[in-house]
Amino acid sequence: MNSHVNPGTAADAIPGVSPDPIHPARYPRRVLLAVAGLSPQILTETLYALAQSGSEAFIPNEIYLITTVEGANRARLMLLSEKPGWFHRLRREYALPEIDFPPENIRLIHDAGGTPLDDIRSASDNDAAADSITNLVRELTAATDSALHVSLAGGRKTMGFYLGYAMSLYGRPQDRLSHVLVSSPFESDPQFFYPSRESRVLTTRDGRPVDARDARITLAQIPFVRLRDGLPKHLLTGTQSFTATVNAAQRGMAAPRLVLHSQALRVIAADIEVPMRPAEMAFYLWLAERRQAGLPSVNGVDAKADEILVIYKRLVGPLDGGFERATAALESEGMTKAYFEERKSRINRVLTDTLGPSACQSYLIHSEGARPKTRFGLLGLLPAQIDITAQRAESAKRSPVKSTHRP
């Protein structure tokens, strides 16, 4: 006979103690997310397996299900109705605590026009499923006080793939991914929802009686690569598409390429346009020209202000207000440490925010050497990876992705 589940205190947040990612069950907000096709049983099977997983069981206090119109209808009728209400029966039978799972937490996959999908039949339906799943995972991983457990057990294979990939993109150290393995002959029986504590006889498709009490469910944890820390900030919020998010993660692994359009005042790094003010672009272009020409990195105090002013003037013209202010400051005081550090910090900040912590590394202004002889430059780039052109950006061979970030 299956043992009575006692959640105990392991699944409760400990007052005054910050949650430890090693112990997801101790987070105050614990969320279970699953995808489902026409078999909502995967949710009760997963919840049962989680509750049986030891002294520090991850008992969710919220559940979300993502599915199609028909899948949602089946989930409401079979899980949340008064009868049979298998979700509520599982909670009562195993004395599980309150779990927030209203009908509103059954999220539908919508097409590009906002119409809920009955099924996933076409390439555009696949794209819609990918975006819906990615956006929900992004939403559920936004709160720092939450831990997310995701089940890949249900839905079409593509839905499981997208859910696993979304976890790679947005999963945090405290988040987990799993699959449930149900013993034969229960794994495909539409009457089976979880192993019962008392005897409950089912009839298999071939007419054979079996007892649900004898079923065994194994929770298999699935390790996954976490790429979240390498994503740009703007992809951690909003509703960016699955494809856009994957491309951003991929750019962090590609060979670097920096394009500077001096006449159009555009900086394009890793095929993304990076918004820079003229003062910062002049400073960055100065370092890029030095790197491209094979000149050594520079010491901030020894940097020649007139070289930067020549580039600044070339970018905006002699009558620009910003150029006039920079000229007045640099001609009277020269290149001060404060001016150098401010330009460097602003440039590195906008590069990090736009490209993400991983993809930006090749394009940052890096330092080398110990103080007071520390020198700075675009040390992550080879000269051949820098393209400086005075032509208008329309002549560029590739169209960059326009960033939504603003400095």
Protein language model features and the residues they cover:
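Conserved SAM-binding loop
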Residues: L152
